[in-house]
From Swiss-Prot:
Keywords: ATP-binding, Ligase, Nucleotide-binding. Substrate binds at residues 76-78, 118, 251. It comes from Yersinia pestis. ATP binds at residues 100-102, 109, 244-245, 300. PROSITE patterns: AA_TRNA_LIGASE_II (PS50862). Its EC number is 6.3.2.-. With EpmB is involved in the beta-lysylation step of the post-translational modification of translation elongation factor P (EF-P). Catalyzes the ATP-dependent activation of (R)-beta-lysine produced by EpmB, forming a lysyl-adenylate, from which the beta-lysyl moiety is then transferred to the epsilon-amino group of a conserved specific lysine residue in EF-P. This is Elongation factor P--(R)-beta-lysine ligase. Belongs to the class-II aminoacyl-tRNA synthetase family. EpmA subfamily. It catalyses: D-beta-lysine + L-lysyl-[protein] + ATP = N(6)-((3R)-3,6-diaminohexanoyl)-L-lysyl-[protein] + AMP + diphosphate + H(+). GO terms for cellular component: cytoplasm. One of its GO terms (molecular function) is acid-ammonia (or amide) ligase activity.
Length: 325
């Protein structure tokens, strides 16, 4: 960017034309399969409770809100889309903006394009197959490999993530020169994520996409716990060429259980000195009314386009990243 006037887009126009073609191809993919495109709000009075996500806040001062109403930019369209599912929408997808007040860099921008879709009556494996179909169509790549979270740790770190004690996880961290972080970290899931990021991610999905599934139940988020093994959740992630592309679940349909998870998130936030975020009670009401058994996935479109174009960074495929927005 140092050689380019700051008003100009960071991405070449040729790349933006290719990006538009990919967006059209994604829409054709879902149209051919009878999946309805929907649009949901980018602002809400409630937000995520996940301790790892930081939402943007804004204030509405219009009619009925003279004192100001706090609104949150959506980190994902998930909550509103589930309300549509509970209302009987059938299979749905959305291509839209999401916002996270976190990183900016090679693979991150605080404003980004998300593809999210939900399939009633699909289990996790059937949705994984559909994600694989989409990736093969857009990226012209080979069919993905699949590994359970446990298998990935055993293969690359020689440790069982479902049974290892924190002391054992720290021993592995020491071999990866991560003791300066791991020795003071008390949260087991944070230790696992550290080991996964450094010891597993760089070695999967090199030549074809890799699906990692059955994450620990403690990392279930909005996913169902497996009925076959209560130690794991019906959750998967997709990696390709060192990039995390997607995160999917067999969706939790129990409103009471979801509320308990949100409340536990907020307790964990309080322990870390983070603000306790407002829980989306409209989502809870929708779940209690009846969310159909379904699976859903969120996929980063900017990263997908980056891979399709063999680009080096997101700024090569989005017109105006945050530094010149």
């Amino acid at each position: 960017m140092s050689d380019t006037a700051s008003w100009q887009p960071s991405a070449p126009i040729a790349n933006l034309l290719k990006r538009a073609a990919i967006m059209a191809e994604i829409r054709r993919f879902f149209a051919d399969r009878g999946v309805l495109e929907v649009e949901t709000p980018t602002m809400s009075q409630a937000t995520v409770t996940d301790i790892h996500l930081v939402p943007f806040e804004t204030r509405f001062v219009g009619p009925g809100a003279a004192d100001g109403l706090t609104l949150y930019m959506m980190t994902s369209p998930e909550y509103h889309m589930k309300r549509l599912l509970a209302a009987g929408s059938g299979p749905i997808y959305q291509l839209g903006r999401s916002f996270r007040n976190e990183e900016a860099g090679r693979y991150h921008n605080p404003e980004f394009t998300m593809l999210e879709w939900y399939r009633p009556h699909y289990d996790m494996y059937r949705l994984m197959n559909e994600v694989d179909d989409l990736l093969q169509q857009i990226l012209d790549c080979n069919s993905a490999e699949t590994l359970s979270y446990q298998q990935a740790f055993l293969r690359h770190l020689n440790i069982d993530p479902l049974s290892a004690e924190k002391a054992q996880l720290r021993e592995v961290a020491a071999k990866l020169d991560l003791s300066n972080i791991a020795d003071t970290e008390e949260d087991r899931d944070t230790l696992l994520q550290l080991l996964f990021t450094v010891g597993v991610e760089p070695y999967i999905g090199r030549d074809k996409p890799a699906f990692i599934y059955h994450f620990p139940a403690s990392q279930a988020s909005l996913a169902e716990i497996s009925t076959e093994d209560h130690r794991v959740a019906e959750r998967f992630e997709v990696y390709f060429k060192g990039i995390e592309l997607a995160n999917g679940f067999r969706e939790l349909t129990d409103g009471d259980e979801q509320l308990q998870r949100f409340e536990q998130d907020n307790r964990n936030r309080a322990k870390r000195g983070l603000p306790q975020n407002p829980i989306d009670m409209n989502l809870i009401a929708a779940l209690k009314q009846g969310l159909p058994d379904c699976s859903g996935v969120a996929l980063g479109v900017d990263r997908l386009v980056m891979l399709a174009l063999n680009a080096e960074r997101l700024s090569d495929v989005i017109a105006f990243p945050v530094n010149i927005a």
